[in-house]
């Protein structure tokens, strides 16, 4: 198991949102594998507030998670799981509408990158980012740009895992990293609305 699948909790909103998106998406052929993300510490439960550090050690010290902004740790808002599930269901609906517009070549190329265990995490994240940006330009959408790109990133996660279920943990972790880097503030705004 890769070390980058563990979280210090700073990306728990992104993890919850992606997990709920995958659970709500139609045509998700790896549904039975989703609980393995929780059991292996990839997904932190808000109720339990259990997270793993980069060494895979369980952290229960009660520290609140946060996000760096201008070099300062800004606490994340409390996350209401019901709101996250509702937003994820709405995003999954949008993803289902965009699904057929994603060319198999884009997914196949991503699968090949994820299968290459010699590629560093940053390179795979860059490949995911390029795929999302390319799709966002190519797919006509009346969605706001951030929402379209967020949905596309999560949809690509589903499509890669559908094609190669053994990549679920790696693609989940990479997508959470990408979403956390690019859409954290957008997700916070969605949760507050």
Swiss-Prot record:
Motif BH3, residue numbers: 87-101
* GO annotation, cellular component aspect: cytosol; mitochondrial outer membrane; mitochondrion
Q: Which InterPro entries match?
A: Bcl-2-like_sf, BID
Main location (coarse class): cytoplasm
Any one Gene Ontology BP term: positive regulation of intrinsic apoptotic signaling pathway
The record's keywords, sorted A to Z, are:
Apoptosis, Cytoplasm, Membrane, Mitochondrion, Mitochondrion outer membrane
Q: Which Pfam families match?
A: BID
| Localization in the cell | Cytoplasm; Mitochondrion outer membrane
Q: What is known of its domains?
A: Intact BH3 motif is required by BIK, BID, BAK, BAD and BAX for their pro-apoptotic activity and for their interaction with anti-apoptotic members of the Bcl-2 family. Apoptotic members of the Bcl-2 family.
Report the function annotation for this chain. Induces caspases and apoptosis. Counters the protective effect of Bcl-2.
- Which PANTHER family does the UniProt entry name for this protein? BH3-INTERACTING DOMAIN DEATH AGONIST
Subunit details for this protein?
A: Forms heterodimers either with the pro-apoptotic protein BAX or the anti-apoptotic protein Bcl-2.
The name under which this protein is listed is BH3-interacting domain death agonist
| Organism the protein comes from | Gallus gallus (Chicken)
């Amino acid at each position: 198991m890769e070390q980058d699948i563990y979280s210090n909790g700073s990306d728990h909103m992104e993890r919850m949102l992606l997990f709920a998106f995958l659970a709500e998406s139609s045509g998700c052929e790896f549904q039975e594998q989703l609980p393995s993300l929780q059991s292996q510490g990839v997904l932190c439960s808000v109720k339990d507030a259990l997270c793993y550090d980069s060494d895979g050690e369980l952290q229960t010290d009660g520290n609140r998670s946060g996000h760096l902004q201008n070099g300062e740790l800004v606490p994340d808002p409390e996350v209401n799981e019901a709101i996250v599930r509702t937003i994820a269901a709405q995003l999954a609906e949008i993803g289902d509408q965009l699904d057929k517009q994603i060319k198999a070549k884009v997914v196949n190329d991503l699968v090949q990158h994820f299968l290459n265990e010699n590629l560093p995490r940053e390179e795979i994240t860059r490949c995911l980012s390029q795929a999302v940006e390319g799709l966002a330009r190519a797919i006509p959408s009346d969605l706001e740009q951030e929402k379209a790109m967020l949905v596309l990133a999560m949809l690509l996660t589903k499509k890669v895992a559908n094609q190669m279920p053994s990549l679920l943990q790696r693609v989940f972790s990479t997508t959470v990293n990408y979403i956390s880097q690019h859409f954290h503030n957008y997700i916070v705004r969605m949760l507050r609305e």
